[in-house]
Amino acid sequence: MDDGDLGNNHHNFLGGAGNRLSAESLPLIDTRLLSQSELRALSQCSSLSPSSSASLAASAGGDDDLTPKIDRSVFNESAGSRKQTFLRLRLARHPQPPEEPPSPQRQRDDSSREEQTQVASLLRSLFNVDSNQSKEEEDEGEEELEDNEGQIHYNSYVYQRPNLDSIQNVLIQGTSGNKIKRKRGRPRKIRNPSEENEVLDLTGEASTYVFVDKTSSNLGMVSRVGSSGISLDSNSVKRKRGRPPKNKEEIMNLEKRDSAIVNISAFDKEELVVNLENREGTIVDLSALASVSEDPYEEELRRITVGLKTKEEILGFLEQLNGEWVNIGKKKKVVNACDYGGYLPRGWRLMLYIKRKGSNLLLACRRYISPDGQQFETCKEVSTYLRSLLESPSKNQHYYLQSDNKTLGQQPVIANESLLGNSDSMDSETMQYLESGRTSSEVFEEAKAVENGNEADRVKTSLMQKDDNADFLNGVEDNDDDMKKRDGNMENLATLSNSEMTKSLPTTTNELQQYFSSQINRVQ
C-alpha cells in the first residue's frame, strides 16, 4: 500500500462525522494488524446518530437485535432448529426502580405477639411469678419498646427464684403424661448400674436423686426421690414378647444345686473320707456291686409307684419326693439313695426320671451321684470309682481308721445278700480278701512274713497300731490295766491270725503268683 492510498484511507477513516468512523472505511481496515485495545476502541465507534438508532430500534419493535431472515429454500427448518434459532429475544432491560429500605418502625405481627404472650404465661406459671408484678413489668416493657423501637428488652422475663413445689409438680406431670408408644424390637436398655445416682440441679437446692435397685426381686426398678421426700417410681422396662418370665429365686436355687453337684474342684480329694457303710451300717461289697448289670433300685421304685400309669400321675408323685429338681422343666429329680435301699454307701444320691418301657411309663434311676458330685451310669462304674479311692495310701488310712472305731475283729457283713449274692457261696480266700480290705501288696508281704516265721510279731504290731488309732479317735487315755489286758488280747489275736494265714495262703512262689493273678482277674 503506497502513501497515497494511506492518505485516502486516513481521510475516509476521519471523514464524514469528524471523530466518528464512517461505514465506507470499514472494508479498508485490516483487523489482523490491530491490537486488542484498538479493536475495543473500534467497536465503540459508530456512524449512526442517536436519533437514527432510536428510530431503527422503534421500527424493530423495541428489540436491540433484528430478527434474522431465513431462506426457506436453503435452510431445512425443523422443531429443534427453530428452538435454537428463535430461542429467546433479548428484550430491552428496563431498570427497576430502587426499593425503599425497610422502615425500622415496623410493628410486630399479632400472631407473634400472641405466641410470646403464651410463652410468658407458661414461664410465669413454671416459676410462680406474681401476676401483678409481671403485668406491670410487661407494661413498662411495652412503653420502652414504643420509645425505642427496633430494640428488644426482656425485662418482663427476669429470672426469679423458682418454687420447689411447682418444679416437682411439673416433673411429675412430665414423667406421667409423656408416654410415647415405642416401636417393636429390642427392649430398652437399663441404665448402667455403676451410675448409682444422678443429680438434676436446677437452682442448687432442688435436686432429684436416682437410685437403681440391684436386688433380684426388683430388677429394672428405678426410684427417684426429690429433696422434699417425693418418690417417683418407674415400672420396669417393657418386656419382649415370648415365653413368660422365669422365677428368679428358683433359677438361683437350681444354679446353686448344679454348682454343688457338678463342681468337683470345690472338694479336696485328698481329704475325702471313703465311707463304705450303707444305711444298715454294713460295708458295701464292691465286687458284688460290680457284677450287677441292672439297676438295683428298680424293684423298689416299681413297688412304690404301683397304680401310677400316666405321666401326670408319676410327675405328681415325683414332686412329692424329698429332693432337688435337676432343671427348670421338672422332669428329673435328685434324691438320697439311702431312702430306697442299702445298695450304695451313705451320701450317694439317685437321679430319678420317667422311663418309657414299651407302652408303659416307669420311674427309674438314670444316674448315680457321688458325694463329691460325680455322676455314673452303672453300678460297675461306681465300684471302679470306689476302688480307685481305696487304692491311694491316704484313702486306705482313712478307711481303716473309720472301720476300726468299732470292735476289733468284727467281720463286716455283706449288704443285700439276696440281690448281690450269698456270702456262703464265696470261697474262703475271696471272703478273706474282701473282708480284710487289704491290697495285693499287703497280702504279698504277709505271705513272705509267714515263710520267714515273723507273721506273729507283724500282726501283733499292726493290731496294736490299729487299737491305738481307735483309742486316739475315741478319746481314751492309756491305763496300766488296760495296757496289760490289751497286750494279752493282741497276743491271742496274733496267734489266731497266724494259724489262719498259714493255712489259707500258698507257700511257694508259683502258687503265690497264681493266687494274685486269679484275685486280680476276679476283681476286674
Swiss-Prot record:
Keywords: DNA-binding, Nucleus, Transcription, Transcription regulation. Disruption phenotype: In strain cv. C24, delayed flowering time during both long and short days associated with a down-regulation of the major promoters of flowering FT and SOC1. In strain cv. Columbia, no delayed phenotype. Residues 45-60 have a biased composition (Low complexity). Expressed in shoot meristems, roots (vasculature and tips), hypocotyls (vasculature), cotyledons (vasculature and hydathodes), young leaves, buds, flowers and stems. Detected in stomata. It is found in: Nucleus. The keyword Transcription regulation applies. Its main location: nucleus. InterPro entries: AT_hook_DNA-bd_motif, DNA-bd_dom_sf, MBD8, Methyl_CpG_DNA-bd. The keyword Nucleus applies. GO terms for molecular function: methyl-CpG binding. GO terms for cellular component: nucleus. Residues 334-406 form the MBD domain. SUPFAM superfamilies: DNA-binding domain. Residues 106-116 have a biased composition (Basic and acidic residues). Residues 75-84 have a biased composition (Polar residues). Residues 45-151 are annotated as: Disordered. Residues 136-149 have a biased composition (Acidic residues). In strain cv. 24, promotes the flowering time transition, probably via the transcription regulation of FT. The methyl-CpG-binding domain (MBD) functions both in binding to methylated DNA and in protein interactions. Probable transcriptional regulator. May regulates developmental traits such as flowering time. This is Methyl-CpG-binding domain-containing protein 8. The gene is MBD8.
